[in-house]
């Protein structure tokens, strides 16, 4: 089973927990976040992103101990999970993100950033 399969399976579970699909905010954490709306799950994404940064910094300063490595993996898992909730809310799938990563594969990050800058400037000029 691939990592993509695991993400897709988790996305299906999240989709099933949407209040519109019968998810109960009283018994499901995902349903509760979705019921509360974007501010709730976006706040969690911000918190998890910060905790990911802190765990990485701890790993930088504490050395690659198994505990610190596990902490970073756990925080990234939390970040991905809450990001999957956001994707579901906005009608997107993990496959959309994977397709974007594949599209970028082989493209220099510097080139990609420069291209986005030109595209943003062109869009602003058209507005």
Swiss-Prot record:
UniProt-listed Enzyme Commission number(s): 3.6.1.31
Superkingdom field: Bacteria
HAMAP family: HisE
Enzyme class: hydrolase
Reactions the enzyme catalyzes: 1-(5-phospho-beta-D-ribosyl)-ATP + H2O = 1-(5-phospho-beta-D-ribosyl)-5'-AMP + diphosphate + H(+)
Family membership: Belongs to the PRA-PH family.
Main subcellular location of this protein, as a coarse class: cytoplasm
Gene Ontology molecular-function annotations: ATP binding; phosphoribosyl-ATP diphosphatase activity
Compartments reported by the entry: Cytoplasm
Alphabetically ordered keywords of this record: Amino-acid biosynthesis, ATP-binding, Cytoplasm, Histidine biosynthesis, Hydrolase, Nucleotide-binding
Entry protein name: Phosphoribosyl-ATP pyrophosphatase
GO cellular component terms given for this protein: cytoplasm
């Amino acid at each position: 089973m691939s990592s993509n399969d695991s993400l897709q399976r988790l996305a299906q579970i999240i989709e099933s927990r949407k209040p519109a699909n019968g998810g109960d905010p009283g018994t499901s954490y995902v349903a509760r976040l979705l019921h509360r709306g974007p501010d709730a799950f976006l706040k969690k994404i911000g918190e998890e992103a910060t905790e990911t940064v802190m765990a990485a910094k701890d790993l930088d300063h504490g050395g690659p101990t198994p505990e610190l490595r596990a902490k970073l993996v756990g925080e990234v898992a939390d970040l991905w999970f809450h990001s999957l909730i956001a994707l579901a809310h906005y009608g997107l799938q993990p496959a959309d993100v994977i397709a974007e990563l594949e599209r970028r594969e082989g493209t220099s990050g510097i080139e990609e950033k420069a291209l986005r800058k030109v595209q943003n400037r062109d869009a602003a000029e058209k507005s």
